[in-house]
């Protein structure tokens, strides 16, 4: 499985390359529009599989207000699923509101893990 860091690097490469950007950015916007998670009130970071130890640690580092907002979005989406209804257009999440809140913590944790592995494999020269 690819790490979040490698996915971000690939995304940055796509955004720096004009030809790839002209292909992938409209496709990504179309995918987000048709996936329907915003009509349930969810942000993209809410879709990250949370039974991963790295994600669990990142969730524990979130500020209290962000944890509350995440839980509220999850409960709203669950209620929409139970009732088989989508949120109205004024209550659905706008694309401008879909900002990453968990990804910075995940990247920080992956950098810490890489640094830990590097320090564990240091050979001391005498």
From Swiss-Prot:
GO CC annotation: mitochondrial inner membrane; respiratory chain complex III
Membrane topology: Peripheral membrane protein
Domain of life: Eukaryota
UniProt entry keywords in alphabetical sequence: Electron transport, Membrane, Mitochondrion, Mitochondrion inner membrane, Respiratory chain, Transport
Subcellular locations according to the entry: Mitochondrion inner membrane
One GO BP: mitochondrial electron transport, ubiquinol to cytochrome c
Main location as per UniProt: mitochondrion
Cross-referenced Pfam families: UCR_14kD
InterPro entries named in the record: QCR7, QCR7_sf
Similarity comment: Belongs to the UQCRB/QCR7 family.
Function: Component of the ubiquinol-cytochrome c oxidoreductase, a multisubunit transmembrane complex that is part of the mitochondrial electron transport chain which drives oxidative phosphorylation.
Subunit structure: Component of the ubiquinol-cytochrome c oxidoreductase (cytochrome b-c1 complex, complex III, CIII), a multisubunit enzyme composed of 3 respiratory subunits cytochrome b, cytochrome c1 and Rieske protein, 2 core protein subunits, and additional low-molecular weight protein subunits. The complex exists as an obligatory dimer and forms supercomplexes (SCs) in the inner mitochondrial membrane with cytochrome c oxidase (complex IV, CIV).
Protein name: Cytochrome b-c1 complex subunit 7
């Amino acid at each position: 499985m690819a790490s979040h860091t490698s996915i971000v690097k690939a995304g940055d490469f796509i955004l720096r390359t004009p030809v790839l950007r002209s292909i992938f950015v409209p496709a990504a916007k179309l995918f987000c529009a048709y996936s329907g998670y915003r009509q349930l009130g969810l942000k993209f970071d809410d879709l990250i599989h949370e039974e991963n130890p790295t994600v669990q640690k990142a969730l524990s580092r979130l500020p209290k207000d962000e944890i509350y907002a995440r839980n509220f979005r999850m409960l709203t989406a669950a209620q929409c699923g139970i009732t088989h209804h989508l949120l109205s257009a004024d209550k659905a999440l706008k694309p401008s509101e879909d900002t990453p809140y968990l990804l910075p913590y995940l990247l920080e944790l992956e950098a810490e893990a890489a640094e830990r592995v590097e320090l564990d494999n240091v050979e001391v020269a005498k």
